């Protein structure tokens, strides 16, 4: 029975005895409904029959929930019969997984997965479509990509014994060529991801801006028709004056309006709504989310979402509870194995390797330790313990609101050899306490209090 929406003042049709003539967005799950949420799923081969000490305990957590979510950050296909190609624009590495991953993930307990991220089209539309086919055959609901923006942005529905779950998936971090669009006139739709475009500005002090203005004015190109004393554009980057030097982001208003409408639409057809966003901003180095993300997450919950699950930076970020709904700003990595093959010719070139001499594993090792190339050099190396530590988040709902959130610290075998690392197990006590204390510190600015009981983090409401 619907009890009460988390939207202020809105009650369900059953609660007030009136016929629902507007399409209620009230939450309507049976008491005890549980959601497991994890971060990035980057895994290349099936694990069910392998030797992975401690992983069975993780599987028990995944299987115990009504809905188990992860970010599907890889493509699934058999390279021997694959008709696509590695794309010139890719998400930093060419992620690829064997077809048996689909049924293996299902057997672990995953029943719903986000697809919108910066790797969604590493292997072109063909890789996107083949991954969709295999997930469909495996019985895993997925959202965030499609043959048009309308398809990519739509909610996908999962039936559970305690209520119907809607999933919507978007990415603020994506390759430009991967953004889906709808048809217009005679121009057909473009397949791809549900993208939320951001406009990034660099915030600088007033004297810094004046120095940049001198550089701009000295360059041999036409200046602006109207000069703004508090903002300028130099070499394609927007600079603005402000108190704190850093980055600021503004969401594209059309994209945001479309996303909010689709959340409302998805919730009208479901009992519980998960929204997930892939956001590397402001960078993998940052423990804090970018300045746009809190406002975005809250707007999505106001529109009907019951949980906001962030991922992208491969590391933990803080947790906020808003209107008795969880906001996970990043759940880090869940799987992070380094066994992807083939890696593609571009990766060999970037890391100065020779495919006739070096191996895919050696390219991957270089990528993890060096990061990815930029005009300023290599940045974003992930060969640090923090990227191999995370949590499994188990949310329990009573009376259609979050009642308890349990956080199980995991470690992904940072010190293991390349062929064996990246598979989660429950962290040993000292490491578990360290992970949870970090999460306490990261969540405190959002007013979230996490207690630690027997190496498990608890948020009780």
From Swiss-Prot:
Presence of keyword Cell membrane: no
Alphabetized, the UniProt keywords read: Plasmid
Return the SMART domains for the record. PGA_cap (SM00854)
InterPro entries with a match to the protein in the record: Capsule_synth_CapA, CW_Biosynth-Accessory, Metallo-depent_PP-like
Q: Where is this region: Disordered?
A: 1-21
Q: For bias kind Basic and acidic residues, which ranges apply?
A: 1-19
Q: Which Pfam families match?
A: PGA_cap
Similarity annotation: Belongs to the CapA family.
What this protein is reported to do is described as: Could be involved in the biosynthesis of a cell wall component.
Output this protein's name: Uncharacterized protein y4uA
Organism listed in the record = Sinorhizobium fredii (strain NBRC 101917 / NGR234)
